[in-house]
Amino acid sequence: MRLKKIRNYLDKQGWKYSYTEEEGLGSIDFEHRGLSYHIWDFEDGGYGAETNVRTVGRQEDILGDYEEEIIEILKTW
């Protein structure tokens, strides 16, 4: 199971989400205040995540400690 820290955060907030895993990589889709969000982790010489949590209309890649960075963004909501 991937994206465990993010899934734990979403569970604590009581936010419903769908989680899928393919080829060992995780994907989370959820809605918040009527907007759809996506977090997809990838491996390309290192792990990262593609997400639209910072700017709902635009995808961005987050590298390094991407789960913590995404959680910090979610905390600002």
What are the residue ranges of the model-derived segments?
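Negatively charged, low-complexity tracts enriched in Asp/Glu with abundant Ser/Thr
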Residues: 1-32, 50-68, 72-77
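Short, conserved beta-strand/beta-arch hydrophobic-aromatic motifs that form part
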Residues: 36-53
